[in-house]
Amino acid sequence: MERLSGLDASFLYIESPTQPLHVCSILELDTSTVPGGYTFDRLRDELALRIAAIPEFRAKLADSQLNLDYPVWVEDDAFDLDRHLLRIGLPSPGGRRELAEICGHIASTPLDRSRPLWEMWVIEGVADTDPRAGGLLAVMTKVHHAAVDGVTGANLLSQLCTAEPDVPPPEPVEGPGKAGPLQIAASGLVRFASRPWQLANVMPTTVATIVKTVRRARTGLTMAAPFGGP
């Protein structure tokens, strides 16, 4: 298992039905450049190979009522790609307006917390074209902010999409592993009990910083005002 950080867990705590906290990206693909042509099944098979190297896409949340710390990530033993890779068609004429409406609806729907916190939507019918005949295709990826930030999201995107068409898929990467409720609670208790010592360790540095700041303020050597630095 892998324990969430306080920042990552906060994205779970402040999320609400009207304020989903996931990150979305949209790619527009020209399928005429795909060697051998595009089919949805082929895209699915290629994605499955890459997900084996992306443990974030195979991990789900786990917690215990006795847990005094943040939730954890565990491997989803029942992971099913078909629950995350979804397919939809744009209504005619398949323009930017129709695409924006579909993407807005997808983005407004919260992710299912009982599964790995991501979805990928394959949107066909862009500009009234058929992707199987070399038309355009949009792919919208939605990942919870508790699982990725800006840098992590960019790294995941680079694993899903390569600059060269014939690059082999990356080697599989092990996930966070398993954990039962008792293990989650026990490790959470240990972390909770260690917090006073962690606080004691940072207190000297914090006090020294406060004293230094007060001395600088008394001598007029304060920090420059916003937008007022050299």
Where are these regions (language model features)?
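Short beta-strand/turn micro-motifs at beta-sheet edges
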Residues: 11-17
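His-Asp-centered acyl/peptidyl-transfer active-site segments
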Residues: 18-23
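Soluble acyl-CoA-dependent acyltransferase catalytic core bearing the H(X)4D motif
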Residues: 1-8, 24-39, 44-230
